[in-house]
């Protein structure tokens, strides 16, 4: 980035999102925002992830003038049930048991906030996963091996989690990991950021 180009900041503590953003070969910094991620009453999953992505970016805006802040949030949805990060083994096993044999939608909210202009671009990018029918012992083994306790839906698609799936459907496979790079590059281009290619 040049001196005239705003700093790029990833508003996340996720190592997975940092690894994804590294793919773009852009210099960036990262910082974890401190926000309440509770779902509002009657808030749709789409509205939830878009709001949280924007709030994550806004939470760091005052500290970072002339910065492009990337906020992102993801939930898994089975029917009307929203699944977040399990946090513990038992919840991960319950989430994967609920997903067994079903189609699960992963909704990723993405926000790019320009703190110099106040302009924000916000979107929800869906990605769908058809899970294989899984036996309880398979689920327990997977959770014990991969420890997906900080991942929405209780799996890591970039690792052993891929064996849990029958089919994938979506615009950008990076969305499943938590950062839709195709849309992000469009947002960055709209802000005048020159990508390496």
Swiss-Prot record:
Q: Identify the main location.
A: cytoplasm
Quick check: keyword Transmembrane in the entry? no
Q: Might you give the EC number(s) for this enzyme?
A: 3.6.1.-
For biological process, the GO terms are: nucleotide metabolic process
Q: Which cofactor does it need?
A: a divalent metal cation
Residues marked Important for substrate specificity (site):
16, 74, 158
According to UniProt, the reaction catalysed is: N(7)-methyl-GTP + H2O = N(7)-methyl-GMP + diphosphate + H(+)
Question: Cross-referenced Gene3D superfamilies, in alphabetical order?
Answer: 3.90.950.10
GO CC, any one term: cytoplasm
Q: Name one GO molecular function term.
A: nucleoside triphosphate diphosphatase activity
* Locations listed in the record: Cytoplasm
Show which residues constitute the signal peptide.
none
State if Membrane is listed as a keyword. no
What keyword terms does UniProt attach to this protein?
A: Cytoplasm, Hydrolase, Nucleotide metabolism
Q: What class of enzyme is it?
A: hydrolase
List the active-site residues.
73
Looking up PANTHER family in the UniProt record yields: 7-METHYL-GTP PYROPHOSPHATASE, BIFUNCTIONAL DTTP/UTP PYROPHOSPHATASE/METHYLTRANSFERASE PROTEIN-RELATED
* Family membership: Belongs to the Maf family. YceF subfamily.
What does the UniProt function comment say about this protein? Nucleoside triphosphate pyrophosphatase that hydrolyzes 7-methyl-GTP (m(7)GTP). May have a dual role in cell division arrest and in preventing the incorporation of modified nucleotides into cellular nucleic acids.
Query: Would you tell me the protein name for this molecule?
Result: 7-methyl-GTP pyrophosphatase
Q: Per the UniProt entry, what species is this protein from, by scientific name?
A: Alcanivorax borkumensis (strain ATCC 700651 / DSM 11573 / NCIMB 13689 / SK2)
